[in-house]
């Protein structure tokens, strides 16, 4: 079984369809567990990260941890106000592109569609500050004030309603690709490792809460007790030309000798 674009894209779509803002990764955790369970026992850390040993390795061999973060950016309801929902962001979100964005409210009684709205520009008054601030935005669900008060409550999570779509040239677009595409790549690599059974021990960590501080990765890494840590993350920019098989970047403190070896592997040498 070889790693292919199609396999990674299929896993990414499955993961992206599961809601999982930081701290509420349960549905995304369940989707990832389903994909990883055939390779080993899946455990959940106290902060909600997923750990799965996919290869026990030989005694005394190094322990490699492959990690990507499972959570996504999203929102949380802070107040139900005359049928509308006030909300706060979970993770780094620019409020300027939020108006008219379709969302899903995950309430106790089920999932409900909504749309982010704001005061129209021509009704905003003559003040000089027309910048969009998240505290001035609302989610419109279409319900009456009485019904909304029964259905929704502070603490309900909200995610983007968009679904992953395949673009031309095998490109995938959609919510939560940061970092579900990294999770899909880690899972694909785990399948290869489980089949080939190398000497080293290999554990997969799909971490929680990266978008709000990275607590899941920090604590999950201690649970894994590894010597080497490989981290896959979505990167935006123009320094990755189409058709290249890999993208590698240097951090301030890389393991000596690891970067050249990773680069060789990426080039197929």
Can you describe what each PLM-predicted range is?
Residues 1-269:
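N-terminal hydrophobic/helix-forming segments and targeting peptides
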């Amino acid at each position: 079984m070889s790693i292919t674009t199609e396999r990674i894209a299929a896993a990414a779509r499955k993961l992206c369809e599961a809601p999982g803002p930081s701290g509420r990764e349960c549905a995304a955790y369940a989707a990832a567990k389903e994909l990883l369970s055939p390779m080993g026992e899946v455990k959940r850390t106290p902060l909600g990260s997923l750990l799965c040993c996919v290869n026990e390795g030989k005694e005394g061999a190094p322990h490699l941890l492959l990690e990507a973060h499972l959570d996504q950016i999203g929102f949380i309801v802070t107040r139900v106000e005359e049928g509308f929902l006030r909300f706060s962001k979970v993770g780094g979100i620019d409020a300027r592109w939020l108006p008219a964005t379709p969302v899903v409210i995950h309430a106790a009684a089920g999932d409900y569609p909504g749309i982010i709205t704001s005061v129209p520009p021509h009704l905003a008054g003559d003040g000089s500050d027309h910048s969009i601030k998240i505290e001035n935005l609302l989610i419109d669900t279409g319900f009456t004030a009485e019904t909304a008060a029964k259905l929704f409550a502070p603490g309900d999570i909200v995610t983007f309603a968009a679904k992953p779509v395949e673009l031309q040239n095998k490109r995938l677009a959609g919510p939560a690709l940061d970092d579900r595409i990294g999770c899909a790549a880690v899972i694909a690599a785990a399948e290869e490792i489980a089949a080939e059974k190398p000497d080293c021990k290999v554990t997969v960590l799909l971490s929680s809460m990266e978008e709000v501080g990275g607590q899941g990765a920090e604590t999950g890494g201690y649970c894994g007790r590894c010597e080497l840590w490989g981290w896959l993350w979505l990167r935006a920019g123009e320094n990755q030309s189409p058709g290249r098989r890999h993208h590698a970047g240097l951090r301030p403190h890389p393991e000596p000798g690891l970067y050249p070896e990773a680069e060789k592997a990426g080039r197929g040498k």
